[in-house]
């Protein structure tokens, strides 16, 4: 892993990449901790990218990996002389566990550094020389086996802490979950069946007669009419027998 403090390696790699694609072009690359996002001076252009980097807290020695390390570049060309200058700022991050700690400087692998500079050279060649984009290696093939979950930690990001310029441009925004769509209403009226009648027991002497509530009705048909209950039927039978005896005398 290499520190941005070893910037001579960055400058050398940048010059080599420029000479491969644009021989004779003279561009310089310098670190500048004063440039800010969306704050390029008149005539300068801005280029931003996020890459994979590793941090270590200088207070508690805790280390963490982030895929949201922001790299900012401001460029000024002199196309008549085929030369220009680029200024780069590498933003740090704070430890999530320590209160009031400083922004730590990230470390990068050699492959990541080359990718950062490839992206910068690509932008310069396309913007100022009309070159086609050079195919780059994806992050997945750089040999970095790390698990990266969760949104961008804006509270501990140096780029996001610049109040005059707001959050860094490449901070991930979490989309709110979509509410489920309401179920469609049916146009035809629903037919509800009447609740089944409750079971009732009625005692007459030593016999128990169960009400018709225990009968099962199919579908929504109306229940059958109730039959004459035994006490009324017995009374009518006695009255008919008495009248018959009266007329036969």
From Swiss-Prot:
SMART domains noted in UniProt: zf-3CxxC (SM01328)
GO cellular component, one term: membrane
Signal peptide: none
GO molecular function per UniProt: zinc ion binding
Upregulation: By interferons. Upon rabies lyssavirus infection.
TM annotation in the entry: 228-248
Pfam family, one: Zn_ribbon_3CxxC
Biased composition (Polar residues): 199-208
Disordered: annotated segments: 173-208
Coiled-coil residue windows: none
InterPro entries on file: R-trans_p, ZAR1/RTP1-5-like_Znf-3CxxC
Similarity comment: family membership: Belongs to the TMEM7 family.
Primary role: Chaperone protein that facilitates the trafficking and functional cell surface expression of some G-protein coupled receptors (GPCRs). Promotes functional expression of the bitter taste receptor TAS2R16. Also promotes functional expression of the opioid receptor heterodimer OPRD1-OPRM1. In addition, acts as a potent IFN-inducible suppressor of pathogens including lyssavirus rabies, influenza A or yellow fever virus. Mechanistically, associates with the viral replicase, binds viral RNA, and thereby suppresses viral genome amplification that replicates at the endoplasmic reticulum.
Protein name: Receptor-transporting protein 4
Annotated organism of origin: Mus musculus (Mouse)
């Amino acid at each position: 892993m290499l520190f941005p403090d070893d910037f001579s390696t960055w400058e050398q790699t940048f010059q080599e990449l420029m000479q491969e694609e644009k021989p004779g072009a003279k561009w310089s690359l310098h670190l500048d901790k004063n440039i800010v996002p969306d704050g390029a001076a008149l005539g300068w252009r801005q280029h931003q990218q996020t890459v994979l980097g590793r941090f270590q807290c200088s207070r508690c020695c805790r280390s963490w990996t982030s895929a949201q390390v922001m790299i900012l570049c401001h460029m000024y060309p002199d196309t008549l002389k085929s030369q220009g200058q680029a200024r780069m700022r590498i933003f740090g991050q704070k430890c999530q566990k320590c209160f009031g700690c400083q922004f730590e400087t990230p470390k990068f692998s050699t492959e990541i550094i080359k990718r950062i500079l490839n992206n910068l050279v690509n932008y310069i060649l396309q913007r100022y020389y009309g070159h086609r984009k050079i195919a780059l290696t994806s992050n997945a093939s750089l040999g970095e086996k790390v698990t990266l979950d969760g949104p961008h930690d804006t509270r501990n990001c140096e780029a996001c802490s610049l109040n005059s310029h707001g959050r860094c441009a490449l901070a991930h925004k979490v989309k709110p979950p979509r509410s489920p769509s309401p179920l469609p209403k049916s146009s035809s009226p629903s037919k509800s069946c009447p609740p089944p009648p409750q079971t009732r027991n009625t005692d007459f002497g030593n016999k128990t007669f169960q009400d018709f509530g225990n009968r099962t009705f199919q579908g929504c048909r109306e229940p059958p009419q109730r039959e004459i209950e035994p006490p009324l039927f017995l009374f009518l039978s006695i009255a008919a027998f008495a009248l018959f005896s009266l007329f036969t005398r």
